[in-house]
């Protein structure tokens, strides 16, 4: 209702406006060559405005035609960028759900645009984690080293890759960079530990293993134990028996030991009493029971086989470790 009223008022205003203009309008004579055109001032103004608008439309149309190739190029470029972005997201999704081969295929086949900007980092990430050879991985991770989002992940992986290539100095540098960004990443600590061991930087090695002990990474205990045994043997070769004993005691305090390390420690440290050796062995057996420790227990103590059996099996679960208990009985001939 209101709109209808507004339209009526508008038409009335136009009618009275034109009537008013016509009342005061004056004649105008336009001379063009030998012709005299008689018109009114109002009509002349209207025709002038129409001519101006027509010229503007024609000029605008010509500009559009001239810019048409560039407009088409921009349109297709945007379409390609959107396609590439979609492909990056799709490749990333495939990688997350474990389809690494499909993610790699999408990344290599569909993505080539340099205009992806932020998405280029995700592109390089997919290419880095799915590349098959070490050099390609290193190349892609190097591109991510300046990315705030991926700098830690790139540094951590570059450390591993350079370690695999036996470039321990470079591996150490990248592992330290990753460590400065995140001190609690156990995988990076393990890489750093390996680097220090290969470079014989034992004080730094011990600092890292002290941190690793807090993570209870049982799968790496044998390797760490071997490193401590290696340090001790090197010290013995250099006639530094006291240092060797000190390293072995550090390993035992951190629960990094096996039967070989314990036997080497017992033979090296003649100040240990039988009770001290027994206590260490019982703790080692509680953490990682093995027949080799039973053998070592029998070797260093004067207890009977029955007493050894009772001492050691009391820390075992009779149901869970039933087979192992039977193996101990067989070894001790009980």
UniProtKB/Swiss-Prot annotation:
Keywords: Cell membrane, Membrane, Transmembrane, Transmembrane helix. It is a multi-pass membrane protein. It is found in: Cell membrane. It comes from the Bacteria. The chain crosses the membrane at residues 1-21, 46-66. The keyword GTP-binding does not apply. Signal peptide: none annotated. InterPro entries: HemY_N, TPR-like_helical_dom_sf. The keyword Transmembrane helix applies. One of its GO terms (cellular component) is plasma membrane. Its main location: membrane. This is Uncharacterized protein RP472. It comes from Rickettsia prowazekii (strain Madrid E). The lineage of its organism: Bacteria, Pseudomonadati, Pseudomonadota, Alphaproteobacteria, Rickettsiales.
């Amino acid at each position: 209702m209101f709109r209808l009223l507004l339209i009526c008022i508008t038409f009335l205003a136009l009618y009275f406006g034109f009537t008013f203009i016509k009342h005061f309008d004056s004649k105008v004579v336009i001379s063009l060559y030998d012709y005299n055109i008689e018109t009114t001032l109002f009509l002349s103004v209207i025709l002038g405005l129409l001519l101006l608008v027509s010229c503007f439309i024609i000029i605008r149309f010509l500009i559009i035609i001239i810019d048409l190739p560039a407009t088409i190029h921009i349109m297709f470029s945007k379409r390609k960028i959107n396609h590439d972005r979609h492909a990056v997201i799709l490749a990333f999704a495939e990688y997350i759900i474990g389809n690494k081969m499909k993610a790699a295929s999408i990344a290599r086949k569909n993505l080539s645009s340099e205009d992806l900007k932020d998405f280029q980092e995700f592109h390089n990430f997919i290419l880095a984690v799915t590349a098959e050879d070490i050099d390609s991985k290193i190349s892609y991770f190097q591109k991510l080293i300046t990315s705030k989002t991926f700098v830690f992940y790139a540094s951590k992986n570059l450390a591993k890759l350079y370690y695999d290539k036996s470039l321990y100095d470079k591996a150490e540098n990248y592992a330290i960079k990753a460590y400065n960004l995140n001190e609690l990443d156990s995988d990076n600590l393990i890489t750093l530990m390996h680097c220090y061991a290969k470079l014989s930087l034992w004080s730094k090695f011990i600092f890292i293993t002290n941190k690793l002990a807090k993570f209870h990474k049982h799968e790496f205990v044998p390797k760490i134990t071997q490193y401590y045994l290696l340090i001790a043997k090197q010290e013995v070769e250099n006639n530094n028996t006291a240092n060797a004993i000190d390293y072995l005691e550090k390993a035992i305090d951190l629960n990094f030991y096996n039967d070989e390390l314990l036997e080497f420690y017992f033979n090296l440290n003649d100040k240990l009493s039988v009770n001290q050796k027994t206590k260490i062995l019982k703790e080692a057996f509680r953490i990682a029971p093995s027949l080799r420790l039973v053998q070592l227990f029998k070797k260093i103590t004067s207890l009977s086989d029955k007493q050894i059996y009772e001492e050691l099996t009391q820390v075992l679960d009779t149901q869970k470790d039933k087979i192992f208990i039977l193996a101990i009985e067989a070894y001790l001939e009980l």
